[in-house]
């Protein structure tokens, strides 16, 4: 079942627990760039994926932006699904980049697999790729 999500800070966000020096290091590296530049684009695309879910039946969806972010970072790092899900659960860089609190830093492998399957079947991944590529080119003047 699709329920639109918005990124609300949680009580266990990394900003609350990380020392300033570590937070600054994350912010200046790829996690900060991903969080500032890419993740907002994914949140904007959230509603475009509502038709991948049943309107009434099923558990509420994991945020689409989160799943898309995991799939993008998985390819960026050339990880398997298993490695990517482990990074979500235990890697501060991934958690910071995806803006996940400690309690949010878990995705079931079946959830990721099923989402990717529905996305590919609907060909939304192609439209998203072209949309994001255009936004990135505009944003960074490439």
Residue ranges of predicted features:
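Active-site- or DNA-interface-adjacent structural scaffold in DNA-acting proteins
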Residues: 102-142
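Charged, often Cys/His-bearing segments associated with DNA-binding zinc-finger transcription factors
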Residues: 1-42
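A general alpha-helix detector
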Residues: 66-72, 111-115
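DNA-recognition alpha helix
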Residues: 84-96, 136
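Catalytic micro-motifs at enzyme active sites that drive phosphoryl/nucleotidyl and oxygen chemistry
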Residues: 59, 97-104
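Basic, short loop/linker segments at the boundary and entry of helix-turn-helix/winged-helix-like folds
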Residues: 27-69, 76-77
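Alpha-helix boundary/capping segments in eukaryotic regulatory proteins
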Residues: 77-85
């Amino acid at each position: 079942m699709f329920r639109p999500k918005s990124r609300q800070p949680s009580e266990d966000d990394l900003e609350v627990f990380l020392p300033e020096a570590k937070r600054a290091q994350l912010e200046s590296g790829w996690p900060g760039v991903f969080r500032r530049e890419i993740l907002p684009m994914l949140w904007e695309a959230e509603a475009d994926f509502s038709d991948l879910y049943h309107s009434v039946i099923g558990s509420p969806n994991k945020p689409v932006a989160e799943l898309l972010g995991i799939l993008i970072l998985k390819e960026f790092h050339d990880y398997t699904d298993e490695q990517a899900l482990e990074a979500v659960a235990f890697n501060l860089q991934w958690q910071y980049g995806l803006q996940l609190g400690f309690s949010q830093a878990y995705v079931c492998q079946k959830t990721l697999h099923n989402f990717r399957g529905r996305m590919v079947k609907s060909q939304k991944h192609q439209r998203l790729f072209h949309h994001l590529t255009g936004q990135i080119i505009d944003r960074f003047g490439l």
